[in-house]
Amino acid sequence: MGSGSEGKAVFYLSHCPKPMENPMSAQLKPSEIVRQLSQHVIGQEDAKRTLAVAIYAHFRRMAANVAIDSVELTKSNILLIGPTGTGKTLLCETLARILDVPFVTADATSLAQTQFVGDEIEAILHRLLDRASDDIDRAQRGIVFVDEVDKLKAIGGEARATSGESVQHALLKIMEGAPVRLKDGRHIDTTNILFICGGAFVGLDHILTQTHTFGFISTTGGDDHKILERLNARVKPTDLLEFGLIPEFAGRLPIVTRLHDLTQDMLIRILTEPKNAIYRQFRAMLAADGVDLQIEPTVFRQMAELAIEYKAGARSLRGIFEEMMTDVMYAVPDNPGIRRVVIRSLFERAEMSTG
């Protein structure tokens, strides 16, 4: 295990989906995928590389749509492990935009709370069809991100939570890659739909500590500690079983990669560097009104510190920034003479001037 299209009233059913009509996704090399991801996602370089290689292999397989040298090419779904706010959903959303494929998210916790799991699972495919504008061929090449799958674990590590296990089995039916008949009579083949699952997996590190015994490995040179650290951080199938995933579900997630807590420097970069960075958005909005927005570096550091204190990672940054800008965005429309806004501290009022 690594760490590491649809017209209305179309009834298309095939165990071997048609070759890709737009092969551009298959032409993207892993390095190009990483480059484009990095324009929107700060940090998590290992996860980017793992995802890029997996996506490259996935779309190459779809483009070929045949066995190569008599070797059958099968789909490999992905598991992202990392704390809240580390960028799991953003990575998946950005990947879908880069690849120009329909994308939907699902919350495993919500699935576990319903008495009609099958209906909710079918609803995921219906939403994928909606995102594909009812183009079945396009939907069959989409991406589904199922978050918080760690919440489907067994209770106490022994007796399995019935609802959690039943959701895992229900998800398996669409993850395994087979034609699914929807209640409206249409069929959708999930063979080429890529499923990416995510979760914090709190407590997994304890399992890794207890089950990994790579201390016997010996190397020459000074990299012994780094090698052992990488090996011991690698998630094995048995670790996921110990955590509470059923063998069949864990087996459908052969590619596993970990995301790590964001540092203060990473959070500052998230505020300022990406194409859609919140700072850039507000500068552009105010510039449209002829106002120049300047924020001192200290303010970004203060926002990053607050996000770390909230323990919500990058997810909390927008709320912090929006709150800081409330007074400014309230004042500017009523005062067309304002031409410059300077913010020197997160905890002080902004300076607004006409010059």
Predicted features and spans:
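Residue-identity detector for glycine
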Residues: 2-7
